[in-house]
Design a protein with these regions (language model features):
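Active-site HxH/HxHxD metal-binding segment of metal-dependent hydrolases
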Residues: 39-43, 49-124, 214, 218-222
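C-terminal regulatory/interaction regions
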Residues: 226-228
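Short catalytic-loop micro-motif centered on adjacent basic/acidic residues
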Residues: 11, 31-34, 60-62, 134-136
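A structural signal for the main folded, soluble domain(s) of proteins
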Residues: 3-5, 25, 59, 164, ...
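Residue-level marker for buried hydrophobic side chains located in beta-strands
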Residues: 31-33, 62, 83, 154-156, ...
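Conserved beta-strand hairpin/beta-sheet module of binuclear metal-dependent hydrolase folds
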Residues: 1-51, 146-158
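Short Pro/Gly-enriched beta-strand edge/turn motifs at strand-loop
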Residues: 3-9, 103-107, 128-130
Length: 228
């Protein structure tokens, strides 16, 4: 299903275990953020068509990190859409390393993926009516990013932060230290609308991030005690 939260931004939910995808209709180009798992591609395609967009009208696809529930359906789009990811995510996506091989649990072959543009922190993408700022937010994975629109104060957070302060698991390439630092950085920004990779959207963003920092610190301390 899809929902329009604010003008030119569409929320697309194809169902678990796939992530939430976000479509931004820009003045200059159309951008999809995260494609979901490959098995949900037909649902994604139909939801895009309900909005009035065919897959060949997508110009860019930005992946928030290197987990298959966020990039699996790229395989059906990468021949006609520019794929963007942070360079730390891109290296895993194209080489099918241990992080990406986890996608076999979803019955998917991890080989054959492409990333056309390797992004860095604070890269910007100007769509005319939307100004997208790339924030490198490692922690969940080393290649995790958030997409921030500073004028609309919207954050598309991938798996970095969720509503109600729910925190992400830490993957093999991530770390609690990086995760807490990334959350603290987000906590300095003005954000009115949180659009996470899973679950509900939120307008209580400052409270959500503060809860997430507290939860991450508690989990990190528990891990340190157990590790001893």
């Amino acid at each position: 299903m899809y929902d329009e939260t604010i003008p030119d931004l569409h929320v697309i939910k194809t169902g678990k275990p796939s992530c939430t995808s976000y479509l931004i209709l820009g003045d200059e180009m159309n951008v999809l953020i995260d494609s979901g798992i490959n098995q949900k591609f037909e649902i994604l395609k139909k939801d895009l068509e309900k909005i009035g967009i065919k897959t060949n009208q997508l110009n860019m696809l930005i992946n928030t990190h290197e987990h298959v529930d966020h990039f699996g359906a790229n395989i059906y789009l990468q021949q006609k859409v520019l794929i963007l990811a942070h360079r730390y995510a891109a290296t895993k996506m194209i080489s099918a390393d241990d992080e990406v091989l986890l996608c076999r649990a979803h019955g998917h072959d991890p080989k054959g993926y492409h990333v056309h543009i390797w992004m860095e922190n604070i890269n910007v993408i100007d769509l005319g009516n939307w100004f997208l700022k790339v924030l490198h937010t490692p922690g969940h994975t080393s290649g995790s990013i958030c997409i921030y629109e500073p004028y609309k104060k919207v954050l598309i957070s991938g798996d970095t932060v969720f509503a109600n302060g729910t925190i992400s698991n830490i993957s093999t390439s991530g770390s609690y230290g990086d995760y807490i630092n990334s959350l603290a950085r987000l906590n300095t920004m003005k954000i009115d609308l949180l659009l996470p990779g899973h679950g509900k959207i939120s307008r209580n963003v400052e409270e959500d991030i503060e809860k997430a920092i507290d939860n991450a610190k508690k989990k990190h301390n528990k891990f340190l005690k157990y590790d001893r």
